[in-house]
């Protein structure tokens, strides 16, 4: 398999769960749990990229490699662009971006996302899974993605896409039957050189409107290959309820 590294963007501020990166999960901070889970993949290296000294200290205390970045980043991708320079990663090296609030992420998904980047010879790859719940289709916190026939992303949105117009007109809570509805999984693969290119791209209006950093890539004309996972991954941690659920999982391990 082609060599890749995992970079984990981590910040302390969180509107819905303040300080969640350092939230205790069965004796270890969440960001450490994420890094340890990522280390189970085939990654040659796992590094946390942060702007907060408390996260740096926590990672170092648990033997996790960490790099400090600016506190001015508005997205994890631009943070990783800075980190890749600080780490002197070669432009061709594949970087997998694993979110810092995914302590249950499957190592196999990390590996597969890196493989999809290589197989499709694109600048960026990500993943999605089929969605079968109408409430999730309508939920703006569940990001949806629609694909073209080559399995590249056409668009990502918090809105319900594709929109089941006829069903909704008829007052029915039915999912579209003509095609699968896909929920985006927040994992990305790209080469270190493309991270630098991303950071130099102008911010797109769609990215700002939807608050979705990947839309910058589509706006500037680059394809994003999408792997459809066979099953939904474990949910990340956005709320106290999510954190309680994850803690319960680790207590049984």
From Swiss-Prot:
Chief location: cytoplasm
Annotated TM spans: none
EC number: 2.7.7.38
GO cellular component terms attached to this protein's record: cytosol
Stored CDD domains: CMP-KDO-Synthetase
Subcellular location: Cytoplasm
Alphabetically ordered keywords of this record: Cytoplasm, Lipopolysaccharide biosynthesis, Nucleotidyltransferase, Transferase
Claim: Cytoplasm is one of the keywords in the record: yes
Keyword Transferase appears in the UniProt entry: yes
Annotated metabolic or biological route of this protein: Nucleotide-sugar biosynthesis; CMP-3-deoxy-D-manno-octulosonate biosynthesis; CMP-3-deoxy-D-manno-octulosonate from 3-deoxy-D-manno-octulosonate and CTP: step 1/1; Bacterial outer membrane biogenesis; lipopolysaccharide biosynthesis
Biological-process GO terms, alphabetical: CMP-keto-3-deoxy-D-manno-octulosonic acid biosynthetic process; lipopolysaccharide biosynthetic process
Reactions catalysed according to its record: 3-deoxy-alpha-D-manno-oct-2-ulosonate + CTP = CMP-3-deoxy-beta-D-manno-octulosonate + diphosphate
InterPro entries: Cytidylyl_trans, KdsB, Nucleotide-diphossugar_trans
Uppermost EC category: transferase
One Gene Ontology molecular-function label: 3-deoxy-manno-octulosonate cytidylyltransferase activity
Summary of the function given for this chain in its UniProt record: Activates KDO (a required 8-carbon sugar) for incorporation into bacterial lipopolysaccharide in Gram-negative bacteria.
Family of this protein: Belongs to the KdsB family.
NCBIfam families: kdsB (TIGR00466), PRK05450.1-5 (NF003952), PRK13368.1 (NF009905)
Protein name: 3-deoxy-manno-octulosonate cytidylyltransferase
Organism, as annotated: Neisseria meningitidis serogroup B (strain ATCC BAA-335 / MC58)
Origin organism lineage: Bacteria, Pseudomonadati, Pseudomonadota, Betaproteobacteria, Neisseriales
Gene behind this protein: kdsB
